[in-house]
Regions:
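Acidic, surface-exposed loops and disordered segments
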Residues: 1-167
């Protein structure tokens, strides 16, 4: 719970957090994903397995949703945040497709970094994983329809005492 909370509290540019984290709990889905992760055992063996997914594009609607949440959280009128909202929308529209992907991926990695730091602080082993077939992950997790792309994976748990990689 603490690791998840750390990712939810992660800083991000403009405060948008253009990503989501999917906790993959279903054993059958993990078995389906394992070959797409080049057979890495952490997919099925780790206590927890997460997919960090970044938005493929940040829309005006995304900014409006964020602005409404910010207004509610701070007790501010949405109209008072209109200037900021317009500024962010303008910045998002300036980005090319590749710039948008790179920017949202960087924001996602900030959250991953917080998850890794929190896991280390709690004594939980964490394995970030970039070795996977992203397009096939996107399909298996139904991400394209949601406007997300699998960015990086994270396996969490405690190592077996006899793990030969433990030092």
């Amino acid at each position: 719970a603490q690791i998840k909370e750390a990712t939810q509290l992660s800083a991000s540019s403009y405060g948008l957090q253009p990503y989501k984290i999917i906790e993959i709990k279903d054993a059958q889905l993990k078995e389906q994903l394992k070959p797409l992760t080049w057979g890495q055992s952490q997919v099925t063996d780790a206590s927890e397995f997460w997919a960090f997914c970044n938005k493929d594009v940040v829309t005006d609607e995304d900014v409006d949703t964020f602005t409404a949440l910010r207004a509610k959280t701070t007790g501010t009128e949405v109209s008072a945040l209109g200037g900021y909202s317009d500024f962010v929308k303008g910045k998002m529209k300036e980005k090319s497709e590749s710039e948008m992907f790179n920017w949202t991926a960087k924001q996602t990695y900030i959250a991953l970094g917080n998850a890794l730091a929190t896991a280390a602080e709690l004594g939980v082993d964490a394995t970030p994983m970039e070795g996977f077939e992203a397009d096939q992950y996107n399909e298996a997790l139904g991400l394209k329809e949601q406007g997300y792309i699998t960015c990086v994976l994270l396996a969490l748990g405690k190592r077996h005492e006899e793990d030969s990689y433990q030092h």
